[in-house]
């Protein structure tokens, strides 16, 4: 399935993750780019793989396809990558 609407509930949640308050509340964050996605996957933090439509990348995890304008709207970078990941924050108690 490809999400193409900015009004989609999941897309709105991804956009909210730009706010620190929302990241802290949900204990989730986005990583951008293949290297960071792979590191998050290796560490068990990756919850969802976000790919620009027609991008081929295989990980054994839930994959969401987004249109280029949607990827741009949720990215914090000037040039958004074709690969992003939704990650869970690890809470370390001291």
Task: Report the location of each language-model feature.
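N-terminal positively charged helical leader segments and presequences
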Residues: 1-80
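Acidic/glycine-rich phosphate/pyrophosphate-binding loops and surrounding catalytic core
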Residues: 78, 83-94
């Amino acid at each position: 399935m490809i999400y193409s609407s900015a009004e989609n509930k999941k897309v709105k949640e991804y956009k909210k993750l730009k706010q620190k308050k929302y990241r802290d509340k949900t204990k989730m964050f986005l990583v951008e780019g293949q290297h960071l996605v792979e590191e998050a996957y290796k560490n068990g933090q990756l919850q969802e793989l976000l790919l620009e439509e027609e991008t081929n990348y295989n990980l054994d995890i839930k994959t969401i396809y987004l249109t280029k304008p949607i990827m741009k709207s949720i990215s914090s970078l000037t040039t958004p990558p074709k690969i992003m990941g939704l990650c869970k924050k690890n809470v370390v108690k001291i």
